[in-house]
Amino acid sequence: IRLSSLRIESDEVVIERLSELRGIGRWTSEMFLMSCLKRLDVFSVGDAGLRRAMRYLYQLHDPSDADLVALAEHWRPYRSVASWHLWRALDNHWIE
């Protein structure tokens, strides 16, 4: 895979292509989209930190993936930015 060619692909195509590589799954591909390709509208529902932050923020006990995805829809087109803020809040112990 030529990583430079991924810049022009959709998020789902990038995830699909990277996931073909051994040891790379959806979460890693989503982090690549956010960190390397600077995509602003990625939400990684499988990220443990985001799940914990959203449970705290929205006072949820055991939300499903669908619940979290639906809540994150309100953050479009900046779901990556919202995610960065939630990670920062966790890192700084602003939320439990």
Question: What do these predicted regions represent?
Answer:
Residues 1-96:
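Catalytic cores of DNA base-excision repair glycosylases
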